[in-house]
Amino acid sequence: MKVITAAKIRDTVSELCIKANLVLRKDVLSALNSAYLKETNKRAKEILGAIVKNAFIAKKEKLAICQDTGLPVVFVEIGQNVRIVGDLKAAILKGVELGYKRGNLRSSIIKNPLLRGKPTDNLAIIHLNFVKGNKLKLMVLPKGFGCENKTQLHMFKPTAKIDEIKEFIISVVKSAGPDACPPFVVGVGIGGTADYACFLAKKALLNKLNAKRYTLNASLESDLLKQINKLNIGPMGLGGKTTALAVDIETYPTHIAGLPVAVNISCHALRSASREI
């Protein structure tokens, strides 16, 4: 049995909040560089170049990649042979608070969605998953709301065809347009219940971009990416063939009477950081 203290979790979450907001993921940066080399639209190419330059400046100067430092979503994988000493939830929330203060990251979270009020920095969305082993993995995804606001869920009939599902996903990207700061990473969740499909769509954003995953979804992801990049939305909505960097699909078994499909879009600043303890 491996023992992990709440203090260790707190400090790790704090560091991950800072890293995620200041250092763009290598796979995202690689995808942006690749898109820059392939883009033929002059204005789109200039915008992609500016996005890449911004990422380098953020890392060098220890500044946030984007002024919207997001709502921290923390995914926790807890090994069955791990014992946590202390309050896990309190440790995560304190880690978020410390990370946002130490990293000089904007406070964006309000405690009451109806009354609004002054933003705070000690709140997060926490997802727990129990796995085999004696490791604890923490993944922090700061989700900006320019793109989060474009999330959509559709409860298809179980008789729905693949083309109908593709049409829905593409329509979500179209409606997001320039507001969600393309080029996008498109996360798709299919199956489960309504809430679980939305969870899967967000979790898909943690996947390494354009990795060769030999799954049944691979051809669908590839086809969707090609169709999305024909929309001519382009970087920041000003045209070009780089509307999305990747499409990632996560699936889960569902009820015979339903077919939930959710789409969660990330802007070009797809930020996340993870660590095993």
Locations of the language-model features?
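Non-transmembrane, aqueous-exposed alpha-helical and coiled segments at domain scale
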Residues: 1-188, 193-277
